[in-house]
Regions:
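Conserved beta-strand-loop-alpha-helix junction that forms the acyl-donor binding cleft
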Residues: 13-16, 37-38
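Polyanion-binding surface elements
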Residues: 10
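Helix N-cap motif at beta-to-alpha junctions
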Residues: 15-17, 77-79
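Vicinal oxygen chelate
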Residues: 1-7, 26-74, 81-109, 120-123
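Conserved active-site tyrosine of GNAT-family acetyltransferases
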Residues: 19-24, 86, 113
């Protein structure tokens, strides 16, 4: 058996509205979903990977985590524009856009403090 790819990235948040606006502003086409079992949440597919944001009650989101840190990374067409949008939404800057050996990148924190890397790798 081997891992052949990612199937899902699920974020739990107590700041659902703020987190939804943040990721939608970065270009994720998140739409409301309700499967009848569990909370209404927002989701989309990015390159075949299910990305979802779920609301979590106080303590619920923490109990679903093992205590580690989750970092999300997105390929974007324009790192500087994505960074500016994130900053306008109040994202905390970890490091500003910079050229890397493989392309351009920036790192910010989403409304819950998770690191979000914005990348562009020229083809």
């Amino acid at each position: 058996m081997k891992v052949t790819g990612f199937s899902a990235v699920i974020l739990w948040t107590q700041r659902i509205d703020e987190t939804l606006r943040f990721y939608q502003a970065l270009g994720l086409p998140l739409v409301e979903e309700d499967h009848g079992e569990g909370p209404i949440h927002y989701a989309c597919y990015i390159a075949g990977v299910h990305f979802a944001i779920f609301p979590g009650e106080i303590g619920e989101a923490v109990s679903r985590r093992s205590g580690g840190c989750t970092q999300v990374g997105f390929n974007v067409s324009d790192v500087d524009a994505a960074f500016a949008t994130a900053k306008e939404l109040g994202a905390k800057v970890v490091w500003e856009p910079r050229d890397m050996p493989w392309g351009r990148a920036a790192l910010v924190r989403d409304p819950d403090g998770r690191p979000v890397e914005l990348n562009h790798t020229p083809q």
